[in-house]
């Protein structure tokens, strides 16, 4: 059996990589992918603690996070496609200048 520490270290590494992508990258698609990576790190943490405790609450929480991530991805990609069609670019600087 793999200790929970390994799962938590992997989740922390995934979350840090996602946070780095959100803070550093300028492309909206890469930022969305980084947010998804952070959500997957949270899922890994939920499932690891559920396995340690022996209950299903972590699995249910992970399914809920997956549903929220799917909705976020669908809405986010629709916004990115609309911005690309109107501006021709998906850089975050272009999104900041959309004030009318």
Curated annotation (Swiss-Prot):
Listed GO biological process terms: ATP synthesis coupled electron transport
Swiss-Prot/TrEMBL catalytic activity: a quinone + NADH + 5 H(+)(in) = a quinol + NAD(+) + 4 H(+)(out)
Gene3D superfamilies recorded: 1.10.287.3510
Topology within the bilayer: Multi-pass membrane protein
Subcellular localization(s) per the UniProt record: Cell inner membrane
Keywords of this entry: Cell inner membrane, Cell membrane, Membrane, NAD, Quinone, Translocase, Transmembrane, Transmembrane helix, Transport, Ubiquinone
Membrane-spanning intervals of the chain: 4-24, 29-49, 63-83
Pfam families: Oxidored_q2
GO molecular function: NADH:ubiquinone reductase (non-electrogenic) activity; quinone binding
A single Gene Ontology CC term: NADH dehydrogenase complex
First-level EC class: translocase
Protein task: NDH-1 shuttles electrons from NADH, via FMN and iron-sulfur (Fe-S) centers, to quinones in the respiratory chain. The immediate electron acceptor for the enzyme in this species is believed to be ubiquinone. Couples the redox reaction to proton translocation (for every two electrons transferred, four hydrogen ions are translocated across the cytoplasmic membrane), and thus conserves the redox energy in a proton gradient.
Self-association and partners: NDH-1 is composed of 14 different subunits. Subunits NuoA, H, J, K, L, M, N constitute the membrane sector of the complex.
This protein's name: NADH-quinone oxidoreductase subunit K
Organism: Myxococcus xanthus (strain DK1622)
Encoding gene, per UniProt annotation: nuoK
């Amino acid at each position: 059996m793999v200790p929970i520490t390994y799962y938590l270290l992997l989740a922390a590494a995934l979350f840090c990589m996602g946070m780095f992508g959100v803070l550093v990258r300028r492309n909206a698609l890469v930022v969305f992918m980084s947010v998804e990576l952070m959500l997957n790190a949270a899922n890994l943490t939920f499932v690891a603690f559920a396995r340690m405790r022996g209950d299903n609450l972590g699995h249910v929480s992970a399914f809920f996070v997956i549903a929220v991530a799917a909705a976020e991805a669908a809405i986010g990609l629709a916004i990115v496609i609309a911005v690309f069609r109107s501006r021709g670019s998906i850089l975050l600087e272009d999104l900041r200048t959309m004030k009318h």
